[in-house]
Amino acid sequence: MALAGAPAGGPCAPALEALLGAGALRLLDSSQIVIISAAQDASAPPAPTGPAAPAAGPCDPDLLLFATPQAPRPTPSAPRPALGRPPVKRRLDLETDHQYLAESSGPARGRGRHPGKGVKSPGEKSRYETSLNLTTKRFLELLSHSADGVVDLNWAAEVLKVQKRRIYDITNVLEGIQLIAKKSKNHIQWLGSHTTVGVGGRLEGLTQDLRQLQESEQQLDHLMNICTTQLRLLSEDTDSQRLAYVTCQDLRSIADPAEQMVMVIKAPPETQLQAVDSSENFQISLKSKQGPIDVFLCPEETVGGISPGKTPSQEVTSEEENRATDSATIVSPPPSSPPSSLTTDPSQSLLSLEQEPLLSRMGSLRAPVDEDRLSPLVAADSLLEHVREDFSGLLPEEFISLSPPHEALDYHFGLEEGEGIRDLFDCDFGDLTPLDF
């Protein structure tokens, strides 16, 4: 190693060489040495050199050596550490549940974790079982089973197997929101809902009522299905269409005429019906946009009289009853009777309301008919042929036909104050002789 930074033959060079030769200094090849020496007096003799040289006296120069520290040179096989980062001391082991393990594990410092800590014993309760939420639910369940809503807190703590202070925590909250009230020190009463007292019996009764309603609903659905099937067969079956009619006797057999009034409603399709059932009276509202609505009264059959559904009877006392007879007429005649057509034109009405008292005294107008067999009403012309002789003394010789007959839509219009019934028909009533009664 060469010395640099000092002139050759300087006073410090021999001393430094002596130190290096003796092995007193261990320097590397890359070490740098800085030598600082003090000035020497020129009159002083030179100091001897060599290992046996005496120590320098007060006049000897001071020699200060400074070496720059250097890190050891890395070997070519070792990886060079990254600048600014500490060397990696851990590695990732994916086979040990993603845990970082040290390369060399030393003895654990401090107190180690007990191996049995965190493992619950079989008899230990979970956190949810001891929670206040579950305890409150169980306490309210005890309140619901109480007959009068009063619960002893000591008994509740024993049943729930919890500390009494937790029962007090629950009761304090419930008392604060006015759901319970303290009867005494250890007794509380439920005030939230009085329906909870004895709710089991009421629940059983309501369940039974619901079961009965479901059975009734199923029975009604079954009857509605039967009626729907019968109506479809009645309207679609050819053999059943000829029997699609109803008589006054059928209507009177449904209800007692002495206590109930039977009314027949003849309405066009798509008629809206609204019924209001109140405690005082019963109201029915009908509304139709397709045509007029006819309402007929089914009269009560008197003793010795004949049903209006068989032949015209003198028992009919109003125009509504005459119209009820028309509605009860057979739509299609049975096979035993000859086919005939029924018309409801005003020209075929027999008598007015003023002539009916006279007919009531004429017993000959009653034609004998079979009570067991029903026949449709015949036309007015055929009836006049049978009773023409009986009317000879009371009525004119001929009836005037009111023509042309009006249709259903013609009755939607009314008459003015100066018009009468003759203005509805194109005929002359001047030749008619007034009837004197």
Swiss-Prot record:
Modification type N6-methyllysine: residues: 185
Query: Motif DEF box: residue span?
Result: 158-194
> Region (RB1 binding): which ranges?
409-426
Question: What GO cellular component term, any one, is given?
Answer: RNA polymerase II transcription regulator complex
Q: Where is this region: Interaction with BIRC2/c-IAP1?
A: 89-191
Q: How is its activity regulated?
A: BIRC2/c-IAP1 stimulates its transcriptional activity.
Annotated positions of the N6-acetyllysine modification: 117, 120, 125
The annotated region (Required for interaction with TRIM28) lies at: 192-382
Instruction: Give the consequence of mutating residue 433 to A.
Output: Decreased phosphorylation by GSK3B
Q: Which CDD domains match?
A: E2F_DD
Task: Tell me what effect the entry lists for residue 120 to R.
Answer: Abolishes acetylation
Positions carrying Phosphoserine are 364, 375, 403
Region annotation Cyclin A:CDK2 binding: where it falls in the sequence: 67-108
Return the Low complexity bias intervals.
339-349
Task: Note down the stretches annotated as region Disordered.
Answer: 42-87, 101-128, 300-349
Q: Extract one GO molecular function annotation from the record.
A: DNA-binding transcription factor binding
Region entry Transactivation: which residue ranges? 368-437
Tell me what happens on changing residue 125 to R. Abolishes acetylation
Task: Show the segment(s) annotated as Dimerization.
Answer: 195-284
- Residues annotated as region Leucine-zipper? 153-174
The entry's DNA-binding region feature spans 110-194
- Asked whether the UniProt record includes Transcription regulation among its keywords, one would answer yes
**Function statement:** Transcription activator that binds DNA cooperatively with DP proteins through the E2 recognition site, 5'-TTTC[CG]CGC-3' found in the promoter region of a number of genes whose products are involved in cell cycle regulation or in DNA replication. The DRTF1/E2F complex functions in the control of cell-cycle progression from G1 to S phase. E2F1 binds preferentially RB1 in a cell-cycle dependent manner. It can mediate both cell proliferation and TP53/p53-dependent apoptosis. Blocks adipocyte differentiation by binding to specific promoters repressing CEBPA binding to its target gene promoters.
Q: Which PANTHER family match?
A: TRANSCRIPTION FACTOR E2F (PTHR12081), TRANSCRIPTION FACTOR E2F1 (PTHR12081:SF43)
- Tell me the protein family, please: Belongs to the E2F/DP family.
What is the official name of this protein in its record? Transcription factor E2F1
Q: What gene name is listed for this protein? A: E2F1
